[in-house]
Amino acid sequence: MSSYENHRALDGLTLGKSTDYRDNYDASLLQGVPRSLNRDPLGLTADNLPFHGADIWTLYELSWLNSHGLPQIAIGHVELDYTSVNLIESKSFKLYLNSFNQTRFDTWETVRQTLERDLRACAQGNVSVKLHRLDELEGLPVAHFHGACIDDQDISIDNYQFTASYLQHAVSGEKRVEETLVSHLLKSNCLITHQPDWGSIQIQYRGRKIDREKLLRYLVSFRHHNEFHEQCVERIFNDLLRFCQPETLSVYARYTRRGGLDINPWRSNTDFVPATGRLARQ
């Protein structure tokens, strides 16, 4: 259980509660969650963050009516800056997008601007939105995380409670390496509903070599951990930085979609350009 799971800031969320679905535009459906909820326990404040990054959302179920009443569909690409006061709660995002379904908009650009304006207001930070027609994306190959996969290790695991201390003494020697490690075994649970969240994670670093067995045990220990996607990625980044002290570090997770949305947070303290193609499970 996270230390803030019962925080009063979460009381008003529609997540985990029975809700009515509206199909006429309503920006008030969007709900934010303060990033400080998980950053404060990690000792992170807005003026001392050890990373930059973004939360990348893909919107697969976005539809509205044009000025003649003809339905339009698009796939949306949203990037929410790491400095925003709030992250966007995903169920509220889904409900908000549903409210576009029977609403008329004059142009695609009006839809894009509306999304960007409302998300910025909810997040209290920078947000960019792009809309793609289906023919722009059809035929694109399934992407994959570049790097060495650490999943096929012949080890026994019987602890699935979050254990940051697995990373203690995970580096040894003075030789510096630069490598990219990948795992598809990341699984955590929604902070509120405890429903499973499945993801793949890519870790790029330069520094003393990280023990792959200890890293895998650490990642698997998220299996019963309750936090939002964005919070898990920041926790992983912070733990790796604290225990392994790499010179450079980038952590990027791509989660499977739920409710027509997928969330793909990344955090880095160096130059890093995240690949945005969907993975096999997305």
Swiss-Prot record:
A GO biological process held by the record: tRNA modification
Entry's Gene Ontology cellular component terms: cytoplasm
SUPFAM superfamilies (UniProt xref): Tetrahydrobiopterin biosynthesis enzymes-like (SSF55620)
Pathway: tRNA modification; tRNA-queuosine biosynthesis
EC number of the protein: 1.7.1.13
Reaction(s) the record says it catalyses: 7-aminomethyl-7-carbaguanine + 2 NADP(+) = 7-cyano-7-deazaguanine + 2 NADPH + 3 H(+)
Predominant place of localization: cytoplasm
Residues that bind NADPH: S90, K91, R258, G259
Record text on subunit structure and interactions: Homodimer.
Family label: Belongs to the GTP cyclohydrolase I family. QueF type 2 subfamily.
Main function: Catalyzes the NADPH-dependent reduction of 7-cyano-7-deazaguanine (preQ0) to 7-aminomethyl-7-deazaguanine (preQ1).
Listed name of the protein: NADPH-dependent 7-cyano-7-deazaguanine reductase
Organism per entry: Salmonella arizonae (strain ATCC BAA-731 / CDC346-86 / RSK2980)
